[in-house]
C-alpha cells in the first residue's frame, strides 16, 4: 500500500515541460513535493499545508526574473499600441518600483495563516527562513528596471517596432495572467496519450503563413549553446508546426532565439528538421521516465509511487538552498 497516495482523484493527468523535467533531474524528492503535494493529504495533512505554502516561495533572485518579464511585457504591450513615450517608460518603471516594494513589505510580514489559499501570494524564501533581505530590495529593483533599459537601448527594440508595423501578426505574452488553454500542445500527433504539454513563448511574429519568428526573454545566468539551440525553443517551434503541418518543416521557416536581458546577447537559429525530430524523441523519452514514478505507470490517474521511491539528491549544496529543506527532513 502506498501510504503517501491520496484517494482523491488528481486534478490533472501527467504533464511534461522542460521545467518539470529539469526539476526531476535536479532532485526526485523535490519533484514529488512540487507536483504531488496532494499525496501527502491523508497521512500528513499539516505537512501538506506547509508544502503548499513552500511551493509559492521564491528567492528574491527568482522574483527579479519574474518581474523583469512583467515589466518588459508591460512595455511591449504599450509599444504595440503606439503609446510609448519617455514619460510612459518612466511611469512603467515607477509602477514596478512601487509594486516590488509593496510585495516585499507584504512578504516581510510573514503572515502564512491562510494555508488553504496561497494562490497568487507573494512570499520570499529569505523572509520565510528568517534571513536578512532588506539590503537586497533596491539592487533587485534596479536590476529589473535596468533590464528594460538595456532592451530599449538594444537593436531588438527597433526590430520589435518594425515587427509591430509590418508583420502579419505579433504575439506578446501576458505573464501576469497566463492563458493556460492557449499553451496546450496537440500531442496526439506525436503519439502521446493522457499527457499534457504546455508551452508559450514570450514573443512571436507571423510574417506569412510559412515564415515565423520566436523570441524568449532570459534574465538568469547566460548559457552559451554550441551548435544547437535550447530545448525550450524547439518545443515552441514544434507547437507551431503541430497546429497546422503535423511535424514536418517542409516549406516552413521558423527562426527562434533566446535573448538575455542582462547582456542582450541572443542565441538561436532557423530551426532544422533534426531539431524537431529530436525534441519529439526527447518528450517521449522523458514521459517514459516520469511514468516509472507512477502507480501502474498510468499517466491518466497520475498517482505517485511511495515517496521513498523518489530519490533525494546527494548534493549538500542543492539541499542547503532548497525551498523544501525542512519538510524533506521531517518526511525522512
What are these model-predicted stretches?
Residues 1-332:
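RecB-family 4Fe-4S metal-dependent nuclease core
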Amino acid at each position: 500500500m502506498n501510504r503517501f497516495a491520496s484517494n482523491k482523484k488528481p486534478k490533472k493527468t501527467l504533464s511534461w515541460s522542460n521545467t518539470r523535467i529539469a526539476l526531476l533531474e535536479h532532485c526526485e524528492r523535490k519533484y514529488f513535493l512540487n507536483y504531488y503535494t496532494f499525496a501527502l493529504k491523508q497521512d500528513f495533512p499539516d505537512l501538506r499545508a506547509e508544502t503548499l505554502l513552500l511551493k509559492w516561495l521564491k528567492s528574491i533572485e527568482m522574483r527579479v526574473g519574474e518581474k523583469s518579464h512583467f515589466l518588459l511585457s508591460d512595455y511591449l504591450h504599450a509599444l504595440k499600441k503606439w503609446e510609448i513615450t519617455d514619460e510612459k517608460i518612466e511611469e512603467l518603471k515607477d509602477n514596478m518600483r512601487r509594486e516590488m516594494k509593496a510585495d516585499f513589505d507584504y512578504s516581510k510580514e510573514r503572515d502564512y495563516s491562510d494555508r488553504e489559499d496561497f494562490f497568487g501570494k507573494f512570499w520570499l524564501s529569505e523572509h520565510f527562513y528568517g534571513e536578512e533581505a532588506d539590503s537586497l530590495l533596491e539592487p533587485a529593483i534596479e536590476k529589473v528596471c535596468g533590464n528594460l533599459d538595456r532592451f530599449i537601448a538594444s537593436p531588438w527594440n527597433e526590430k520589435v517596432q518594425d515587427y509591430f508595423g509590418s508583420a502579419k501578426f505579433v504575439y506578446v505574452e501576458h505573464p501576469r495572467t497566463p492563458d493556460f488553454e492557449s499553451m496546450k500542445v496537440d500531442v496526439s500527433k506525436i503519439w502521446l496519450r493522457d499527457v499534457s504539454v504546455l508551452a508559450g513563448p514570450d514573443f512571436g511574429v507571423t510574417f506569412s503563413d510559412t515564415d515565423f519568428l520566436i523570441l524568449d526573454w532570459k534574465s538568469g545566468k547566460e548559457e552559451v549553446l554550441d551548435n544547437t539551440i535550447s530545448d525550450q525553443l524547439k518545443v515552441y517551434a514544434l507547437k507551431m508546426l503541430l497546429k497546422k503541418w503535423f511535424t514536418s518543416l517542409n516549406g516552413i521557416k521558423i527562426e527562434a532565439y533566446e535573448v538575455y536581458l542582462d547582456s542582450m546577447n541572443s542565441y538561436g537559429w532557423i530551426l532544422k528538421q533534426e531539431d524537431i525530430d529530436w525534441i519529439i524523441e526527447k518528450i517521449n523519452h522523458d514521459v517514459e521516465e516520469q511514468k516509472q514514478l507512477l502507480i501502474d505507470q498510468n499517466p491518466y490517474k497520475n498517482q505517485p509511487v511511495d515517496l521513498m521511491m523518489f530519490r533525494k539528491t546527494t548534493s549538500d549544496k542543492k539541499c542547503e538552498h532548497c525551498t523544501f529543506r525542512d519538510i524533506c527532513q521531517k518526511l525522512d
